[in-house]
From Swiss-Prot:
Organism per entry: Drosophila melanogaster
Keywords attached to this entry: Cytoplasm, Cytoskeleton, Microtubule
Recorded GO MF terms: gamma-tubulin binding
Any one of the GO CC terms: gamma-tubulin small complex
Disruption phenotype: RNAi-mediated knockdown has no effect on nuclear positioning in fat body cells.
Transmembrane segments: none
Protein name: Gamma-tubulin complex component 3
GO BP terms in the entry: cytoplasmic microtubule organization; male meiotic nuclear division; meiotic cell cycle; meiotic spindle organization; microtubule nucleation; mitotic cell cycle; mitotic spindle-templated microtubule nucleation; spindle assembly
Length: 917
């Protein structure tokens, strides 16, 4: 007896603990309420658990742990704290305490399920009160509430009727036990488990429910009528195409299907889950429909976008056909069921026509359509508001994902999308036309550019519209093909069509799917290559043949780049007087006759007259202090197709002519003025050697130094830079198969010459070279002044000698004191002038050496190895290096990295010794 009493005390204590825990859990969920409201909630919870514990245990609803997690998630969303802890943490502690008690697991699962319903209903009530539509009940929670409420109501009605079961125990006994206020009555029965789980007999139960009423058949009552099953299946079929049915309604916010609140109680848990699962196909169907509707604004744009939309509509039409077959099959079976006829002979793409259509069969059927609709939705979603090549590239990215069905689907979509693109390409490369209303073609025509700039600037690539599967070299070929056709038609006035044009167009448009092939060896790529080669050859033959492109390039090299040496020398000799005049006094009409005379007096007279007619001399606008050398230049004028090809290079020739003309100017000053004047005056001033010998000697040395520098510069520029690169250009032009190859080689030739002529280098190179030229001009001025003073003194001495000779003839010997004093004064002034002249010459020489040193330093630090080697050759005997300490210093590591002169075995390279093991 003592042991039974102790066990009873333990059970009572455990029941009290469980009751307290449940009370606190309800407070966590509902909050602190009035006592009568709290007791009512406890009473309702006790009834629900007692009535539905078996239903919860046998169903496939949420597990106990999932219920706890959902409760904590809902409580965490409230952001409410009690005594420094959140409500969810407090509930978690209470749940851990409950698991430590001797509570039946099934009863605890039922308790957590009902607490989840209570939490969800509490949040829903708060959301309605605050008019916040964002909080919605889960579909499965709705199923749970509906099922449990319906079962509870059934049990309550049985209690009122007093129906007894087969064992003579009234249903009121169940509710009587469950109606005990508080949780002790619930948990008391659950706590007795194992050996202590013997059922106690209650004598009051035998006197309840003795009425003479028969017990209904619950198994037959739970069976569903065929019409109800058919309605459920039809609701699922309707949802495939986005149509709402009896059991499935659309959520206006998410667009997904949810169970109907009124009819959810007629569904089992399995049926509800399968309906929600099947309705996913309708959700993705609606997404595809939205993407294929141009009025929504979520679809792709342009003609290629229209092709994608058309393909999506075709996919939807095929899907609708499959769903229609399911619907027809369901209607036939329904009619056969009504008529009592089993139609088992027919078979369709859906389930067998002779068998009943069920949700399980629909689940087996809908997998492939769902997979296809999901990928269509993903692809269409990625293509929103895209067009042209960008649209094609987006779809192209979905290829090769490892699924054969998806690869085939993407290939079909790409084939449809590339149809307009292939037609635009074929029209461009066969006719030279652009049919692009939506600006989705990767070739664009610039309307503001004139015909004279057609070849270089009229047509460009629109890189954002270039598909990923069209490589850049193929895009350039397509661009050049259409551009060549426009060039032949609009400039060369060639109206002939391409050979086999119709056949090429037929091949290209019939093989649109080959445009995104991984290997460019398809018939489509071969057709594009054929068009490119034929058009390029036609343009090249016309430009090299009738329009003499190569001859004109040779003419510009000889006259604008001073390759015809005798011509430029005679031209300067003819215009030397005009070149020294002020710029305002020079007129182009006077120079034209001098140009013609120079052409007739040199080997240029044997050139093609068509080439010579393009050569002209121009006078630029003069500025203050400009002379003829600064404003006179040669110009090569081109017209027609040549202008379209070469007009863009004319500014480069103009830039190149300036340093070459400046170099010729310095050569003319040194040879025809300074040196020639020195040689002519040396004999005349021989008698004054004692007075001017020092200055003359320094002048001769300085002149030789400058002439060596200028001659080296001319040799390097005219031969090593221009001539050598011209030879390379001729080789490339002979091997060229397209006009673009010639133009690209010519452009590279000009850019190389720009570097070799010190034009496109650092500003310090060009500036220091200009300082050298300015010192040469200063030397010319100094020499003119020097010889002027020398000849003035020489003439004074000769005049004095004549006076002495005349006096001797007259018999009067000697000079007057006045004459002697005047002569001595003039000699003294001349000596002072010679000293000043010597110092002035040294200043010019010093400035010259400084400029040359700066020029050499700039060459040594240049990025071009040829300029570095040229700097080394200019100072081959280290003359300037010995006189300038900066040139003797090693280059910094920065310049050593930029330099390509120093080899691996150079002493400037730091070599780490190899470690020996």
């Amino acid at each position: 007896m003592s042991q039974d009493r102790i066990a009873g005390i333990d059970v009572a204590t455990n029941s009290t603990d469980i009751s307290n825990i449940i009370n606190e859990m309800i407070i966590c969920i509902k909050g602190k309420q009035m006592p009568e409201v709290h007791e009512k909630a406890m009473d309702h919870l006790s009834k629900m658990i007692a009535a539905n514990s078996r239903v919860i245990r046998d169903s496939n609803m949420l597990t106990e742990r999932e219920c706890v997690q959902k409760i904590m998630k809902l409580l965490s969303a409230r952001n409410k704290k009690e005594e420094g802890k959140t409500v969810s943490d407090h509930f978690n502690e209470l749940y851990r305490k409950l698991t430590l008690t001797k509570c039946d697991p099934h009863m605890r699962h039922s308790l957590m399920t009902h607490l989840l319903t209570m939490t969800d209903n509490s949040d829903a009530e708060k959301a309605v009160a605050s008019e916040d539509p964002r909080t919605q009940c889960d579909n499965l929670t709705q199923i749970l509430v509906s099922r449990l409420n319906s079962i509870s109501s059934s049990i309550a009605s049985l209690n009122e009727m007093g129906v007894v079961n087969g064992n003579g125990v009234g249903a009121a006994a169940v509710t009587g036990a469950a109606a005990v206020t508080g949780a002790a009555a619930v948990t008391g029965a659950a706590a007795v488990t194992g050996a202590a789980a013997s059922h106690s007999y209650d004598a009051t139960q035998s006197s309840i429910g003795l009425r003479k009423q028969s017990l209904p058949n619950y198994l037959d009552a739970t069976k569903m009528l065929p019409e109800s099953r058919h309605d459920i299946v039809m609701s699922a079929i309707y949802s495939f195409t986005g149509v709402q049915g009896k059991y499935l309604k659309k959520d206006v916010v998410t667009g997904r299907f949810k169970l109907d609140q009124q009819n959810i109680k007629f569904l089992t848990t399995g049926q509800a889950g399968m309906l929600l699962r099947l309705s996913e196909l309708g959700y993705y169907h609606d997404r595809v429909v939205k993407f294929s509707d141009v009025s929504t604004g979520f679809n792709a744009i342009g003609s290629m976008g229209q092709a994608l939309i058309s393909k999506l509509k075709e996919e939807l039409a095929n899907f609708h056909g499959q769903v229609a077959m399911l619907h027809d099959e369901m209607q036939r079976f329904r009619q056969a069921s009504v008529n009592g006829i089993a139609n088992k002979g027919k078979k369709d793409s859906g389930p067998d026509a002779g068998d009943e259509m069920t949700l399980f069969k629909l689940l087996a059927w809908y997998i492939k359509p769902l997979h296809r609709m999901q990928w269509l939705t993903k692809i269409a979603d990625a293509c929103q508001v895209k067009k042209g090549g960008d649209l094609a590239s987006t779809v192209y990215d979905f290829l090769d994902n490892g699924n054969d069905m998806v690869n085939k689907l993407v290939e079909d979509l790409l084939t449809a999308i590339c149809g307009p693109l292939v037609r635009m390409i074929s029209k461009w490369i066969l006719e030279g036309g652009i049919s692009d209303m939506h600006r989705e073609f990767f070739v664009k025509s610039i309307k503001d550019v004139g015909v004279d700039r057609l070849w270089h600037d009229k047509f460009r690539l629109r890189l954002p519209m270039l598909p990923k599967f069209v490589p850049m070299d193929m895009a350039n070929k397509i661009l050049m093909t259409g551009k060549s056709i426009n060039f032949l038609r609009e400039i060369c006035e060639e109206q002939g069509m391409m050979k086999e044009r119709d056949e090429l167009m037929k091949v290209m448009e019939s093989s649109a799917s080959q445009i995104f092939s991984y290997t460019p060896d398809t018939s489509w790529h071969a057709a594009v290559e054929t068009c490119y080669q034929q058009t390029s050859k036609h343009v090249l033959d016309i430009m090299v043949g009738p329009h003499k492109l190569l001859d004109h390039l040779h003419g510009m090299r000889r006259y604008l780049l001073l390759g015809q040496g005798d011509f430029i020398s005679i031209l300067i000799e003819n215009m030397k007087n005009e070149l020294e005049r002020p710029g305002l006094d020079i007129y182009a009409n006077d120079l034209t006759s001098m140009l013609d005379s120079a052409l007739r007096c040199t080997n240029a007279q044997y050139d093609d007259p068509d080439i010579l007619n393009h050569l002209d001399v121009i006078v630029q606008r003069p500025f203050n202090g400009d002379i003829g050398w600064n404003i006179i230049s040669l110009q090569y004028i081109v017209h027609g197709p040549l202008a379209a090809m070469l007009e863009s290079t004319m500014p480069t020739y103009k830039v190149l002519f300036k340093p070459l003309w400046r170099m010729k100017h310095m050569e003319f000053v040194l040879s025809m003025k300074i040196w020639k004047e020195q040689m002519g005056n040396a004999k005349a001033l021989r008698t004054m050697k004692s007075e001017i010998g020092k200055a003359s000697h320094r002048l001769n040395l300085f002149t030789s130094e400058i002439m060596h520098f200028i001659h080296q510069m001319q040799y390097y520029v005219l031969f090593e830079v221009i001539e050598c690169n011209w030879v390379e250009l001729q080789k490339k032009m002979q091997k060229a198969t397209t006009l673009d190859e010639i133009l690209e080689a010519h452009e590279k030739f000009l850019q190389t010459i720009l570097v070799g002529c010190f034009v496109s280098n650092k500003a310090s190179v060009e500036h220091s070279l200009e300082v050298v030229y300015e010192n040469i001009i200063e030397l010319e001025k100094w020499q003119s002044s020097f010889y002027k003073d020398c000849f003035k003194e020489l003439n004074a001495r000769k005049e004095l000698s004549k006076i002495v000779e005349k006096s001797e003839k007259k018999g009067v010997y000697g000079l007057t004191n006045k004459m002697i004093l005047q002569r001595d004064q003039e000699a003294k002034i001349f000596a002072e002038k010679m000293d000043i002249a010597c110092r002035g010459l040294e200043v010019i020489a010093t400035d010259y050496e400084k400029a040359v040193s700066t020029f050499l330093m700039s060459l040594n630090s240049s990025d071009d190895p040829n300029l570095q080697l040229f700097g080394t050759r200019l100072d081959f005997n280290e003359y300037y290096k010995k006189r300038d300490t900066n040139l003797s210093k090693p280059l910094t590591f920065e310049h050593m990295r930029m330099s390509n002169v120093f080899a691996v075995n150079s002493r400037f390279v730091i070599c780490t010794p190899s470690t020996q093991e």
